[in-house]
Amino acid sequence: MSGEEAPQASETGDNAIAMVTEATEELYRVRDTYFPRDPADKTSRIRTLADTALARLDSVPVEQRKSAQQRAMLEFLKGKILDVFPDYNKEAEDHLSKAVKLNPSLVDAWLCLGNCIWKKGDLVSAKNCFTLALSKGPNKKVLCQLSMLERSMSQVNIIGQEDQATLVDESIKHAKEAAMLDIKDGNSWYNLGNAYLTSFFVYGACEHTKLQNSLKAYQNAEKDELMNSNPDLSFNCATAHKYLENYERALHRFEAAASQDPSLGGDEEVRKIISVLDKLDSSVKKVRNKKLTSMALNLGEISLEPAYRGATVDSLSEGINTGVAVLAKVLLFIKHDNIAPLYCLLIDSNMCRFILSVFGLQFESVKEGDCVTLLAPNYREVDVSWKGKHCQFKLIRVDFAKQILINGRRPSLRQIACTSMISQNKS
């Protein structure tokens, strides 16, 4: 397509606008599915295709520019072609604005105008465009963009009446509606996965069910062959696995994302995970036995609620241990580069060393020397092999503040974390 010559002025009839439409669709197909290792190659190819599409548009004969609907369509196509690049384009906005004035029923023009205005930071006006588009009837593309915009709005908090969580809940709602309009459309499922992933962070990175819902949506997205080459899908799927502590799956997906689009930083995410695993593995193995004995003897007693019975780590089953409480001492706070979770090395009364991962609490909430009680502990044995490295340790995961007592007390409101993830504007 990039090598096509500009059409000649002799091209007349209804085919002229149809050919511009076809060229514009090809332009956006390349934008959304072409991911070379060098981003400059993509920019160059898109620019060539955009020039070809504009040349086709300029060649549309005068007789195909007479009615308001024809002029609206041509203004829309020109604005859409100019808006294909990531940065805001004033000329694109002008053409798209003319299109919706000439034909207020042109849904695609409202959608593109909203995307264009979003790029210059006017999120409220962008939302108005999407809302006007939806007033013409349900539309999966508009619903997806509205869902993305609501996530973006939740990060900058520009609407005082709507708090962050409400906006993200609306984002999930609109993403679901888009997916239900076409259950085979991978992009809609991908958008829903992103909405759940953002929701996990907005609600304090403490509800792993949101991560699981995110992965289910991504799995549905992958059923669409058009999504197989999307590096953002691989990267976001890897992110969900990372926070579910499915380390090997996360490593494989980040590596896949890095091979598809190096600019996303998948290689750096792999490095971070390996670094964390090394720290966790070595911390379990390197603590001196003398220190272990001293800490274990100083555990003391914590009175448990009747619903719980005391247990040690070695007696736990894989998964959630309902009705069980583990008393342990914090030996070491383990620093790392990610926003969550909080990692600590603990020891129980049997001198069993294990890693505690805590989601939803501020980093300073648990300190070395603290005595913690883990209620209904979610236990697993981590065993990861990756390119010659092998890490193995016992892990208890805490997703909610109500699952942990620190020195016999529930975490205070000040100790509960609130993290966030920025939504990317990707049409």
What does each model-found stretch correspond to?
Residues E318-D337:
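Structural detector for short beta-strands of small beta-barrel domains
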Residues L331-F359:
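OB-fold (S1/OB) nucleic-acid-binding surfaces
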Residues A55-Q69, K98-L102, L132-V142, K176-N187, ...:
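Flexible helix-coil transition and linker loops at the boundaries of alpha-helical arrays
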Residues L74, A109, V142-L143, S188, ...:
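TPR alpha-solenoid repeat register
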